[in-house]
Amino acid sequence: HDAHIIRKIIQAIAPQPGQHLLEIGPGQGALTIPLVNSGATLDVVELDRDLAGWLQHHFADCERFTLHMGDVLKFDLHTLTQLPRSIRVIGNLPYNISTPCLFHLLESEALIDDMTFMLQKEVVQRLAATPDDDEYGRLSVMVQYFCSVEYLFDVPPGAFKPAPKVTSAIVRLVPHRHTKDQAMDSTLLRDLVRTAFSQRRKTLRNCLKPMIGDLDASALPVDLALRPENLTVADYVRLSNAICRLRHDATR
């Protein structure tokens, strides 16, 4: 691994003694070693049996290191802590699990102080995208609903061995301490955003038909002639809350 890139990532994380870190997919410990050396307490989740064995052996004498062998998508952060904003999450997420892993972690976002990930550059571009960008979509809206997104820097393909074929990037996600635009029903918001972006080239009036149904469309706070990529995160929250209220009124 490229020592310069490792140093840069560690500087971005800036781990401190006494902090509680969770590393996902530590692999051969390129980040794990400097994270442990920082004096922080480190839990790691590793799925690969051989790598887990190597990590367990390498860190056998370190009482601040705990290995959890298994799938991060089944890992419950509440087994580590009940304290709000107490865990810092770090990981090099493979492309095929990056989106499900982010959504899984966001289910426990109240426990998380911040998250720093290495992801494929195109995933980071989607996370950081704003309305009217080609990359703006479901992932952008839902992650930005929960977190501020900071695109830190790119990592060239040659920085890691074996070299991935694509450029990666480092991103920091910080859960909002106070969400000014709060969804009354976060499951409804999630369904709304998924439904909208499943047909992103259509107008909202067309792609949201299954959600709006017989509700009074004139009472909705957004222009239904717009397309899904034109709405901000706050627009989606307002729209979701309006649908929530209209559904509630319709059942009274």
PLM feature segments, named:
Residues 1-195, 238-241, 248-252:
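Catalytic cores of RNA-modifying enzymes
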Residues 175, 193-252:
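C-terminal lobe and adjacent flexible extensions of AdoMet/dcAdoMet transferase-like proteins
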